[in-house]
Amino acid sequence: GHAEKSILNKMNIKHRRNWHINSWVDLCKIMMDEIIVVNGALNFGLKSVARAMYNHDMISTCWNNEMNGLQAMETMIDCEEIARKQNKRFQDLKHVKDVMKYNEVDCKVMWEIISYFREKI
């Protein structure tokens, strides 16, 4: 989506890097363009599709909390400030670990969805 591209651009500026991704794949767009629907999915969003597929035993991974992408980003911003003020390592903060797990599940769910459709379609 758009957010990932914007975040990458901001990180390149902030860290004076030139990380470049030639090809972005938007799973939501693919599902909408190909009209792939899953019984129980209320929309084409990752969480809705993944939860529906999980409920139908089509994938084996799902989130165990109610965090969303915006909350994850806000948490990381807050943790950066907390780590600085408390002179702690950013990656040692509990909330950072929670966001890392949330993002890990995001990636694993996308991989399982893609794998499922590659195998079944």
Regions found by a protein language model. Give the residues of each.
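DEDD superfamily 3′-5′ metal-dependent exonuclease/proofreading module
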Residues: G1-I121
